[in-house]
Amino acid sequence: MPVLLRNVAWIACVIYSTIPAFWLLIHPQADFWRSRKRSPYRILLPTWVAMWVAMVGFTAPWHGVAFYERRWTWIPAIGLFGAGLLLYKLSRNHFTLAQLGGLPEVLRGQNPQHLTTTGVRAYVRHPVYLGHLCEMLAWSMGTGLAVCWALTAFATVTGAIMIKMEDRELEKRFGEQYRQYRSTVPAILPKIIM
């Protein structure tokens, strides 16, 4: 496998794997971040970049170790890349860029806030996170890199914790409307409709 492709896969998985950790900084303390006079992103974004650097340092010793190298694994990987990109596109429908960027969670005065339960969100509550998972699985499957598989597992565990915290924060914000939505729509894996 070309070194450039291996390194792109590794860095992509490093960045994706830290997304749940980034949000774990936000959701338990959403009220704190909203109470700040200045944008909390001045603290949060450099902290997230520091997470990337730390994860690169931690995983660098084995970033070239592959479980396998098979060209055919790129066939399902391309399907996963496509699914991830489609989920990102569908996630934009009925959702503002501010919502996608998490501004209502951290900035005060981000009104009006409304719960979006249509489109792709009628099938899965967190389609962007599902898109991230598809992208990480695609890099892992296509490259066979141990580090990509490990980072995907790490993101899955931290993502599950983060989703629980985000659900609590959304329930606090939207109340019974969110409780009903959560009881009928799965978090990540959509129900298959036949």
Ranges and model annotations:
Residues 118-133:
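Membrane-interface loop-to-helix entry segments
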Residues 1-117, 135-194:
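Membrane-anchoring alpha-helices and their flanking helix-loop junctions
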